[in-house]
Amino acid sequence: MKYSQNKSLNTFEIEYKIANKAVQIKSSGKMGVITKELKLKESVIQANNTYYLKNHGDSRIIIGTMKQQIQGVLAGFCIELKLVGLGYVVHKVGNTLVLDVGYSHYRSCVIPVDVVVKLEGSQIILYSINKEKVTTFASLLKTFKKVNMYKGTGILGINQIIKLKKGKVR
């Protein structure tokens, strides 16, 4: 099946194929093409040229995935992280991100294929049309230096607010 919408700025197209216990969704727009296959808990029933899902949860999964794909191919997803701490530095070497976040050695990770990384001072800007990949990569970067609740240092989201704990009272 194929669905397309054509307005002045928002142009996208969705194709989907339904098998016994799987749905393959392909979205395309001005930013690119995303293809994802979802495994279903129950099988799909076809009656009178209409598809029915036995499990209501499966239909919510498909709707949510289609919404994410439409937003991704129209505008994309952007996540901003900031390094807070004395001497915390990040460098981009080829397709690898190298972080110096207070350990005796550098921490490095490979940038996924669909994710674009831009560095501005102590900020890391991640951009992709695939929400799953960009959020997974951002959470991986956050695990390299967790937030210190007493000092407020670490790798944070740009709008993340930290409530500092009280230190020892002497």
From Swiss-Prot:
Keywords: Mitochondrion, Ribonucleoprotein, Ribosomal protein
GO cellular component: mitochondrial large ribosomal subunit
Source taxon at top rank: Eukaryota
Record carries keyword Amino-acid biosynthesis: no
Gene Ontology biological process terms, A to Z: translation
Localization (cell): Mitochondrion
The family this protein is said to belong to: Belongs to the universal ribosomal protein uL6 family.
Stated name of the protein: Large ribosomal subunit protein uL6m
Organism: Dictyostelium citrinum (Slime mold)
